[in-house]
From Swiss-Prot:
The keyword Nucleus applies. Probably involved in the regulation of pre-mRNA splicing. Residues 125-147 have a biased composition (Acidic residues). It holds the Pfam family XAP5. The lineage of its organism: Eukaryota, Metazoa, Chordata, Craniata, Vertebrata. Disruption phenotype: Fam50a depletion results in early neurogenesis defects, abnormal anterior development impacting the brain, eyes and cartilage apparent at day 5 post-fertilization (5 dpf), and lethality occurring by 6 dpf. Disulfide bonds: none annotated. InterPro entries: FAM50A/XAP5_C, XAP5. It comes from the Eukaryota. This is Protein FAM50A. The keyword Nucleus applies.
Length: 341
């Protein structure tokens, strides 16, 4: 049986090539594993920043159980308003930032890919030089097989793969740009909200003592219900003697059959498009009450005059219509369909 009888250096060279290929295969596997681990870390980071349940309203309810002084209530009101503004700003800002960042990342990815392709080069003379060096080594060390096997093999330079996604790698310039863009969006959003809050609206309300007495005042969208009741009290005192000794804490504001807490602002209902049992809470113009119209199904965005009521009157008459329909406002409760009973 014929056998191949080549130089001993050929066997050594073959072993070198086998070891070289094995090392390259191991490096490739390590690179794949590292990319998979980095992608998993990125996924875990994204999950940590997912939206979570906002418990601000629940905390306010639990902290205002029982009698609370006016100063404490004002402090809690201010803290709640600031917290709500931050949450709304963060939510709106996150949406706008995500869109802009995706566009920027796509643009940078394409530019980086073009740059890497342009810089990627392979030297054709490198292979020839390596072959010449190996031939010289074979001629000089034919009888020293083991020593030849241990000689280091010159590695070819591996070019970078332009298709690999490197967006998850740390990049100080990119992070600074994202932070700057995020801050600009936040400031722009806050300016828009302040402009909305400063806009003036006309509030039509009815002082309710068993019958309605309609009045109108002008307020700003950023004003709270407490500020509105203070203004309404100034208007009503000259016509109703029972209100001359009353304070804001003795009054209730009823809008669409819901008892609205004093710390809420008109802005809160406008930006969230909140709805009540019998109409929207974000409209303050007046339409006919649907309970006095033949077809109650035509009501959509029509609003009714809110009622200003003394707490003492409500406690005496809460079992009688319309007070029997009133219930405390709950921001978590949805009134997608209006009711008239």
């Amino acid at each position: 049986m014929a056998q191949y009888k080549g130089a001993a250096s050929e066997a050594g060279r073959a072993m070198q090539l086998m070891k070289k290929r094995e090392r390259e295969r191991e490096q490739l596997e390590q690179l794949k594993q590292k990319i998979a681990e980095d992608n998993m870390v990125k996924s875990n980071i994204d999950k940590k920043f997912s939206a979570h349940y906002d418990a601000v309203e629940q905390e306010l309810k639990s902290s205002t159980v029982g009698l609370v002084t006016l100063n404490d209530m004002k402090a809690k009101q201010e803290a709640l308003v600031k917290e709500r503004e931050k949450q709304l700003a963060k939510k709106e800002q996150s949406k706008e930032l995500q869109l802009k960042l995706e566009k920027q990342k796509e643009k940078k990815r394409k530019e980086e890919q073009k740059r890497k392709i342009a810089s990627l080069s392979f030297n054709p003379d490198e292979g020839e030089d390596e072959e010449e060096e190996e031939e010289e080594e074979e001629e000089e060390e034919e009888d020293e097989i083991e020593e030849e096997i241990c000689l280091p093999v010159k590695k070819k330079k591996l070019g970078k793969n332009p298709d690999v996604d490197t967006s998850f790698l740390p990049d100080r310039d990119r992070e600074e740009e994202e932070n700057r863009l995020r801050e600009e969006l936040r400031q722009e959003w806050e300016r828009k909200q302040e402009k909305i809050k400063s806009e003036e609206i006309e509030i039509t309300f009815s002082y309710w003592d068993g019958s309605g007495h309609r009045k109108t005042v002008k307020m700003k969208k950023g004003n709270t219900i407490q500020q509105f009741l203070q203004r309404a009290l100034e208007v009503l005192r000259k016509d109703f003697s029972e209100l001359r000794s009353a304070g804001v804490e003795h009054l209730m504001y009823i809008k669409e059959d819901l008892i609205i807490p004093h710390h809420h602002s008109f802005y809160d209902f406008i930006v969230t498009k909140a709805r009540g049992k019998s109409g929207p809470l974000f409209n303050f113009d007046v339409h006919d009450d649907i309970r006095l119209v033949n077809d109650a199904t035509v009501e959509k965005d029509e609003s009714h005059a809110g009622k200003v009521v003394l707490r003492s009157w409500y406690e005496k008459n809460k079992h009688i219509f319309p007070a029997s329909r009133w219930e405390p406002y709950d921001p978590e409760k949805k009134w997608d369909k209006y009711t008239i009973r």
